[in-house]
């Protein structure tokens, strides 16, 4: 946003009586005085020249010599020679320690140089010397505002307004201070007054729009930006800000048009590039987003947010190294911003580096203990480490901070379900859906929990709703599996066909469709699906086990034995694979081998009836300790 700058005024020379000065010299001095003090419209160079002639003439004493140095300082500052201006202001106050205007203008210059403490010291002196200088109060208010001491800045703006009730710039700057303090209502009142005093103040209209935006009233914000642009059709900040309001309303087309116009008017407008990049990011056009973020950091290398945004685009594009590099730079530039640690933590978690992810998310929480999202993400990192004892308390804290945090309820439900507590899981999925009735993932996960409880009808009902909201391959796959468990292989195959259509690389869907075909005794077709699953996932023990079972049912003992061997090699804790191999060996009259396999299956799963029945047939006892 724009801050109005205080325009410095030149001091007037006192009437001079110069002993011994000739008429011609006096006339020449008068010309230079008019030029030096700004009474005539001249260039800064002409003004500096005239001031220098008078200063070097030796004909002036304090306080008039102080005025000449002050006015030359004004011209030097206007030319951008801040060091020269500072030297002249210093000489002015040395020559005349009661020269309030010189202290005020040196304070203003020091403020421009961000030398805030010395600026305030000068302005304190200026105000002590002239307590009616509204401009000095205004400038000191600006200095306190830059120090983020908003109460003092507002007090100074109050005094400036008391001294000059029509001082529009003071209302404008007090509005800025109230906004930065988070007092949006008082900020709007001040902008109202600034606009009343100057209805064509595009900056005040723009800034009032920003406050409406921050209050969440996007329509009023847009109305103010529209009015600012009617006043000044080339005001790039208003286009940028209106674009942000359109983006917040979900109108990406209008947002892009406004950001385009802002950049056209101001080709190095880093913030507009950053904001346009965010629109492209939301549209998942990561290449365009990254190009805009590139421009944002090129034109503003200190913009930590733009580095963070570019990191997000790289991360979602799958380029974790580039993402982490950007987050590193964002953290270097803004090490107290919890969001950058949070984003880097997510990238590291996605890369499987759970310990470093947890460290980053912990730092985010140290910086911002109220960051519910960071608790949720750290909980998810613990969950992926199968550390449910740490995951669940983090989800608890996320929910405590945000009782409507649907994702945290869903994630805690997953942890409970994986712990074997489907009832608690279902309770959490219910809460997630209460917070967000269109949350397809919570319906999908609740369906899994119902399946774990053996309630296939409720599982199918949840998958139905999940598919209506978001028809994913996983939802079709799980519903197909549920139909199969309900004894409806035809409906299962229809769902699994759709799952494979949506995700042709889903080994699970091929395995489940193979199982459905096997139930129909279409063993060759089933084995074709299992084979495809193995091609997609060569270490899928479940695919080998199921193909072994299909071969066994088809009487293909050699093939069944080979697949059972491979399933066991990939998963030594598969009771089903041992039991199947035991059946094949029993059929091949390898009773010793069959007994060994049945015993191993029972050792893994003592409740498994199939190997127990095999041992009974072979009149063999289970292994010691297996029951």
Model-derived regions, located:
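Short coil turns that delineate tetratricopeptide repeat
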Residues: 63, 97, 131, 165, ...
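Terminal, low-structured helical/coil segments at or just beyond the last alpha-helical repeat
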Residues: 30-35, 587, 595-627
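Conserved structural position within tetratricopeptide repeats
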Residues: 53-56, 60, 91-94, 125-128, ...
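Conserved alpha-helical positions within TPR/SEL1-like repeat arrays
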Residues: 67-77, 101-111, 135-145, 169-176, ...
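N-terminal leader/linker segments that initiate helical-solenoid repeat arrays
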Residues: 23-63
């Amino acid at each position: 946003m724009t801050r109005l700058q205080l325009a410095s005024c030149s001091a007037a020379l006192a009437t001079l009586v110069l002993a011994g000065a000739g008429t011609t010299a006096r006339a020449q001095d008068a010309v230079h005085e008019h030029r030096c003090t700004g009474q005539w419209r001249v260039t800064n160079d002409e003004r500096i020249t005239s001031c220098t002639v008078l200063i070097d003439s030796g004909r002036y004493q304090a306080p008039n010599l102080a005025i000449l140095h002050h006015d030359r300082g004004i011209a030097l500052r206007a030319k951008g020679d801040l060091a020269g201006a500072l030297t002249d202001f210093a000489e002015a106050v040395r020559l005349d320690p009661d020269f309030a205007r010189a202290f005020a203008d040196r304070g203003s210059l020091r403020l421009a140089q961000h030398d805030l403490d010395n600026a305030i010291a000068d302005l304190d002196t200026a105000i002590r010397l002239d307590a009616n200088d509204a401009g000095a109060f205004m400038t000191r208010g600006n200095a306190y505002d830059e120090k983020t001491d908003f109460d003092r800045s507002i007090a100074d703006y109050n005094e400036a307004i008391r001294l000059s009730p029509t001082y529009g710039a003071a209302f404008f700057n007090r509005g800025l201070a109230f906004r930065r303090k988070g007092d949006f209502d008082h900020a709007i009142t001040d902008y109202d007054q600034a606009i009343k005093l100057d209805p064509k103040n595009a900056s005040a209209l723009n800034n009032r729009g920003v406050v409406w935006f921050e209050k969440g009233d996007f329509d009023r914000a847009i109305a103010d930006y529209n009015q600012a642009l009617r006043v000044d059709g080339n005001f790039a900040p208003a286009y940028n800000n209106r674009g942000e309001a359109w983006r917040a309303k979900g109108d990406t087309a209008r947002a892009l048009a406004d950001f385009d116009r802002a950049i056209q008017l101001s080709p190095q407008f880093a913030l507009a590039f950053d904001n346009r990049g965010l629109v492209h990011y939301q549209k998942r056009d990561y290449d365009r987003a990254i190009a805009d973020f590139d421009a944002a950091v090129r034109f503003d290398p200190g913009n930590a947010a733009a580095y963070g945004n570019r990191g997000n685009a790289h991360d979602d594009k799958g380029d974790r190294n580039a993402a982490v590099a950007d987050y590193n730079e964002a953290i270097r530039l803004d090490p107290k911003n919890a969001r950058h640690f949070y984003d880097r933590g997510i990238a590291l978690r996605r890369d499987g580096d759970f310990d470093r992810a947890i460290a980053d998310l912990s730092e985010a929480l140290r910086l911002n203990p109220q960051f519910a999202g960071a608790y949720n993400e750290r909980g998810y990192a613990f969950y992926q480490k199968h550390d449910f004892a740490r995951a669940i308390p983090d989800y608890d804290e996320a929910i405590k901070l945000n009782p409507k945090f649907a994702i945290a309820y869903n994630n805690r439900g997953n942890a409970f379900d994986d712990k074997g507590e489907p009832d608690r899981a279902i309770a959490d999925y219910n809460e997630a859906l209460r917070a967000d009735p269109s949350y397809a993932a919570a319906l999908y996960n609740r369906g899994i929990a119902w399946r774990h409880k053996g309630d296939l009808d409720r599982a199918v009902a949840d998958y139905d709703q999940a598919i209506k909201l978001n028809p994913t391959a996983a939802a079709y796959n799980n519903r197909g599996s549920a139909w199969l468990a309900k004894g409806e292989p035809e409906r299962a195959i229809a769902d699994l066909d759709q799952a494979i259509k949506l995700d042709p690389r889903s080994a699970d869907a091929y395995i489940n469709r193979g199982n459905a075909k096997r139930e129909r005794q279409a063993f060759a077709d089933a084995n074709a699906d299992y084979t495809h699953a193995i091609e997609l996932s060569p270490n899928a023990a479940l695919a080998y086990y199921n193909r072994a079972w299909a071969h066994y049912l088809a009487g293909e003992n050699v093939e069944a034995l080979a697949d059972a061997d491979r399933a066991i090699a990939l998963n030594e804790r598969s009771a089903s694979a041992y039991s199947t191999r035991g059946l094949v060996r029993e059929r091949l009259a390898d009773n010793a081998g069959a007994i060994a396999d049945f015993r191993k299956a029972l050792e893994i799963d003592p409740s498994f009836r199939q190997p127990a029945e095999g041992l009974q047939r072979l009149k063999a006892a289970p292994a010691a300790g297996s029951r």
